[in-house]
Amino acid sequence: MHEMALTQNIIEIVEEQCRRNHVNKVTDIWLEIGPLSCVEPDAITFCFDVYSKDTVMENCKIHFIPVPALAYCWHCEKTVKIKTHHDACPECGGVHLQKQGGDELRIKEIAVE
């Protein structure tokens, strides 16, 4: 479960920002997550609840913002939405796609008191 390491990294980043900005309490965190990221939001939430104990993020709520997976089709020359790494172009059925997003897991926003 690589979500454990990802969650620890998220916590480290948020803690560093809190130190820099003299913040004592984080109430909400919004994460952008793409369908190609291979990350399970439920696993992130579970790990976050465990690792955030006794930190400025204890009882913080995690929100997930879905980011579409886009790819450029070399056959029909269109940018299309895809759902998995192995999708064909939904417009023409072409298989030569260049992914242009959808694999991200990014901290978008942090709400503090």
From Swiss-Prot:
Zn(2+) binds at C73, C76, C89, C92. Transmembrane segments: none annotated. It comes from the Bacteria. InterPro entries: Hydgase_Ni_incorp_HypA/HybF_CS, HypA/HybF. One of its GO terms (molecular function) is nickel cation binding. One of its GO terms (biological process) is protein modification process. Ni(2+) binds at H2. Keywords: Metal-binding, Nickel, Zinc. Involved in the maturation of [NiFe] hydrogenases. Required for nickel insertion into the metal center of the hydrogenase. Belongs to the HypA/HybF family. This is Hydrogenase maturation factor HypA.
